Regions:
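Domain-terminus/edge residues, biased toward the C-terminal soluble/receptor-binding domains
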Residues: 72, 86-88, 92-93, 98-317
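Active-site-adjacent loops and short helices of periplasmic peptidoglycan-processing enzymes
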Residues: 1-92, 98-105
Length: 317
């Protein structure tokens, strides 16, 4: 693990601090714990200069990542987020960013840690996570508190109960008590009123049931084969799971529309229909139903072959 000497020029960083002094030596991992557990702005600047060379270049890297993650209402100026009119984000963008960050095992490990001992110059320092919901509210496993005079009290929480995993973002609270209460109320409301639905499985089950109940559905004019072999384009299903309000689960609509009459030849990969999916309070999406085999058109060879089959069957009889 890289060890960094803490430089004197970083001492002027305002806001909450890890408490580093000039020429302190600390590992990158310990800086990350100091950043995420106790909002160490001095740790943020030290990491930014280590990674980006300077604060401006690191801010540029953050803004590039924001574009990749489609954080359309976010712009970074600094690694610590102290008040600046050009440094801003939204609750929605913070949720997207948190969802991405939680996929990183190191990040996840740190933000779910209630207390941790770091070493500065080989001297131990105890850190206690400032996230008041960690270890207090059932299912909470992170992620970060925040405060500036401009933003007031903020908290991003991650919480999982059963198969429902949510991110809750509360911004602009006047007090820590308000931040805690609002977060708890929002989280409990979601788990009391929403369920996770595997929409991909629902679509597949509906489609397989349709095939089972409509084995002789297709009428293929001038066809040498009797039936199609159809499948759905699973790549068009935009997500596997969706959180749905409990009272609206039965309002999920999956409608299969397939043309019953076709004329040969029907090529493989030919679209024969669509599935319309309508979710509660969201826009619908469609999935193509595709034929997987080529259906040949009857021709002279087909009729000759059928004649010979019938002829020799009569001779055998």
């Amino acid at each position: 693990m890289n060890k960094l000497p803490f430089q004197k020029k970083l001492l002027g960083t305002g806001g909450s601090r890890l408490g580093l002094s000039t020429n302190d030596t600390i590992t990158v991992e310990n800086l990350l714990y100091g950043l995420m557990m106790v909002s160490g702005n001095d740790a943020a600047v030290a990491l930014a200069e280590f990674i980006g060379g300077d604060i401006q270049n690191f801010a540029n890297l953050m803004n590039e990542k924001a574009q990749i993650l489609k954080l359309t209402s976010t712009h970074f100026i600094s690694p610590h987020g102290l008040d600046n009119d050009e440094h801003f984000t939204t609750a929605y963008d913070l949720a997207l960013l948190t969802d991405y960050a939680l996929q990183n095992e190191t990040f996840l490990k740190i933000v779910k840690t209630p207390n941790y001992t770091i070493n500065i110059n080989n001297h131990s320092k105890q850190l206690n996570n400032t996230n008041e919901l960690l270890g207090y509210l059932d299912g909470v496993y992170g992620v970060k508190t925040g405060f500036t005079n401009g933003a007031n009290r903020c908290l991003v929480s991650a919480c999982k109960r059963g198969n429902l995993d949510i991110i809750c973002v509360v911004l602009g609270c006047d007090t820590k008590k308000d931040r805690t209460k609002d977060s708890i109320n929002l989280i409990n409301y979601v788990f009391s009123n929403y369920s996770i639905v595997n929409i991909e499985d629902l679509i597949k089950i509906e489609f397989e049931n349709w095939k089972k109940n409509n084995k002789n559905y297709f009428k293929i004019n001038k066809s040498a084969e009797e039936n199609l072999n159809i499948y759905i384009n699973e790549a068009q299903i935009p997500f596997k799971h969706i959180a749905v309000y409990n009272s609206e689960i039965n309002n999920i609509s999956i409608i299969i529309n397939i043309s019953s009459y076709l004329e040969a030849p029907v090529l493989s990969d030919y679209k024969v229909g669509i599935i319309n999916v309508q979710l509660p309070n969201t826009s619908s999406f469609t999935i193509d139903i595709i034929n997987s085999i080529t259906i040949r058109r009857k021709n002279i060879y087909y009729y000759t072959n059928m004649f010979l089959k019938d002829y020799f069957s009569l001779l055998t009889f």
